[in-house]
Swiss-Prot record:
Recorded catalytic activity of this chain's protein: a UDP-3-O-[(3R)-3-hydroxyacyl]-N-acetyl-alpha-D-glucosamine + H2O = a UDP-3-O-[(3R)-3-hydroxyacyl]-alpha-D-glucosamine + acetate
Keyword Hydrolase in record: yes
Any one GO CC term of the record: membrane
Functional description taken from the UniProt entry: Catalyzes the hydrolysis of UDP-3-O-myristoyl-N-acetylglucosamine to form UDP-3-O-myristoylglucosamine and acetate, the committed step in lipid A biosynthesis.
Organism: Oleidesulfovibrio alaskensis (strain ATCC BAA-1058 / DSM 17464 / G20) (Desulfovibrio alaskensis)
Single Gene Ontology BP annotation: lipid A biosynthetic process
Cofactor or coenzyme needed: Zn(2+)
Transmembrane intervals: none
Biological or metabolic pathway of the protein: Glycolipid biosynthesis; lipid IV(A) biosynthesis; lipid IV(A) from (3R)-3-hydroxytetradecanoyl-[acyl-carrier-protein] and UDP-N-acetyl-alpha-D-glucosamine: step 2/6
Binding site for Zn(2+): H77, H234, D238
Name this polypeptide is given: UDP-3-O-acyl-N-acetylglucosamine deacetylase
Length: 305
């Protein structure tokens, strides 16, 4: 399996979650072995950032990357789309300091990538594969990883809320599975948190148009949920995006319990800092390519945990 990039430059604009201002995003083809690279345009010039786990400077409302005084926030949905669609090399130009939130999912980014087209390059794809079982745990939340030829995610969430409760999903992530099952799941938050954030000048771009918002009992969005288990699907989306910072796609079997951006990044830093123990660099030849079956419940049906 060879490396890939997009066939043409494509862009969009949208509201920034934090600033509430319009942000311009442009995606460009990139040469082999480039990986994912950000060009962040600010008032003092253009800053180039090839993200790694230790470039994460904040994990509060979203994952924020920073280097040499420049930063870009809410990167996880775009990164999930890039990894989910198996694009290896791409340049991301951003005018401002955050990725547009769009509708709160990765669907718009998948649409952009498909519209740009995917070009197969000449060099073989390089991936990181989990070498041996590893567990990362904090405060009853954990990530367990084991060797696997592909990307399989078993994810469970538990919320003391009648509209969420306990949800689980087990999925083998392929481009088809990502686009059809994961990409459309939106981010979610609680009304009490939104009101607090707005009162403190935060999340000014957040609304019912780009997030699922819940009060103490119900979903407030007029159109309801896209899937009965949209919450766990979005957590898988976030996980894929947060795992995209190694410099190459990550393969393994991941069992995840109630994780979030901070735990995801802590896990990624651990396996990155101890690469010789936990990671194996693998070159995927064309003859080794195989299709992974989608191991997931039918749309809208949680898997019993």
């Amino acid at each position: 399996m060879n490396q890939t990039t997009i066939k043409k430059t494509i862009g969009c604009s949208g509201i920034g979650l934090h600033s509430g201002k319009v942000v311009r995003l442009t995606l460009r083809p990139a040469p082999e072995d480039t990986g994912i690279v950000f060009h962040i345009r600010t008032e003092d010039g253009v800053h180039r950032l090839t993200p790694r786990p230790d470039d994460v400077i904040a994990t509060g409302l979203a994952t924020t990357l920073g280097l040499n005084g420049s930063s870009v926030a809410t990167v996880e949905h775009l990164l999930a789309a890039i990894r989910g669609m198996q694009i290896d090399n791409i340049q991301i130009d951003i005018e401002g300091n955050e990725i547009p939130i769009m509708d709160g999912s990765a669907a718009s980014f998948v649409f952009l990538l498909k519209d740009a087209g995917i070009a197969r390059q000449n060099k073989p794809r390089q991936v990181y594969r989990i070498k041996k079982p590893v567990t990362y745990e904090r405060d009853g939340k954990w990530i367990k990883a084991a060797p696997h030829d592909g990307l399989r995610i078993e994810y469970t969430i538990e919320f003391d809320h009648p509209a969420i409760g306990r949800q689980s999903m087990d999925i083998e992530v392929t481009p088809e599975a990502f686009a059809g099952i994961i990409a459309k799941a939106r981010t979610f938050g609680f009304l009490r948190e939104v009101e607090y954030l707005h009162s403190n000048g935060l999340a000014l771009g957040g609304s019912l148009d780009n997030a699922i918002v819940l009060d103490e009992y119900n979903v407030l969005n007029e159109d309801g949920l896209r899937f009965d288990d949209e919450f766990v699907r979005h957590k898988i989306l976030d996980f894929i995006g947060d795992m995209a910072l190694l410099g190459a796609p990550l393969q393994g079997h991941f069992q995840v319990h109630c994780s979030g951006h901070a735990l995801n990044n802590g896990f990624l830093r651990t396996i990155s800092e101890h690469e010789e123990l936990y990671l194996k660099r693998v070159e995927l030849s064309e003859t080794a390519q195989r299709e992974h079956a989608v191991e997931a419940a039918p749309a809208g049906t949680p898997v019993a945990a």
